[in-house]
Amino acid sequence: MLRAGAPTAGSFRTEEVHTGTTIMAVEFDGGVVVGSDSRVSAGTAVVNRVFDKLSPLHQRIFCALSGSAADAQAIADMAAYQLELHGLELEEPPLVLAAANVVKNISYKYREDLLAHLIVAGWDQREGGQVYGTMGGMLIRQPFTIGGSGSSYIYGYVDAAYKPGMTPEECRRFTTNAITLAMNRDGSSGGVIYLVTITAAGVDHRVILGDELPKFYDE
């Protein structure tokens, strides 16, 4: 006889894997910086400590993933496929706005089935660096945006610390500080920080390891 509270066959179902996360993107004159933490969890268990949540959509367009890991990656893969075809038809790289619209349309079409929030950011010859939020099928261009479970802890910081006209290095420092603060407070965010800087010259990838993260007074 089963005891009360004893595990049953049904209780061993695999929980959905989530990128309970902190993602961020910032525009600067000539490009963008996109960043994320690296923790992936299923329920209370951490299933991946170093997952890269910055997914390329095209050569100079990336998206930052949050929500269900499978759903977010599915949206990114569908968008990347459509943008590849779009680029072949136009015989030139797609615009960042076009990429954001593709992600927005997919997110809205499957809003009842998929649990994901993507930030789209990149560079093109027409508008330079651009950052778009696509939550729930909306589309908003912003000088910077944040997302994921950790974002609720850093709205005050990013509003106070952001200033127009920052250099690429200042944007990287701003992004690193914000994500570090979120990782300190949000149990679903953690690991390392991935940074991608996108300009006309190309894409620069960086990883900020745990012992390289900035230190704050509350630690």
Swiss-Prot record:
Q: Reported effect of changing residue 177 to D?
A: In LMP-2b and LMP-2q
Q: Which CDD domains match?
A: proteasome_beta_type_6
> Under the GO molecular function aspect, what terms does this record hold?
threonine-type endopeptidase activity
Q: Which GO terms describe its cellular component?
A: cytosol; nucleoplasm; proteasome core complex; proteasome core complex, beta-subunit complex; spermatoproteasome complex
GO BP field: antigen processing and presentation; proteolysis involved in protein catabolic process; response to bacterium
What InterPro entries does the record point to?
Answer: Ntn_hydrolases_N, Pept_T1A_subB, Proteasome_bsu_CS, Proteasome_sua/b, Proteasome_suB-type
Chain residues in the propeptide: 1-20
Query: Does the record's keyword annotation contain Protease?
Result: yes
The record's catalysed reaction(s) read:
Cleavage of peptide bonds with very broad specificity
* Recorded family membership: Belongs to the peptidase T1B family.
- Record-given protein name: Proteasome subunit beta type-9
Organism whose genome encodes this protein = Mus musculus (Mouse)
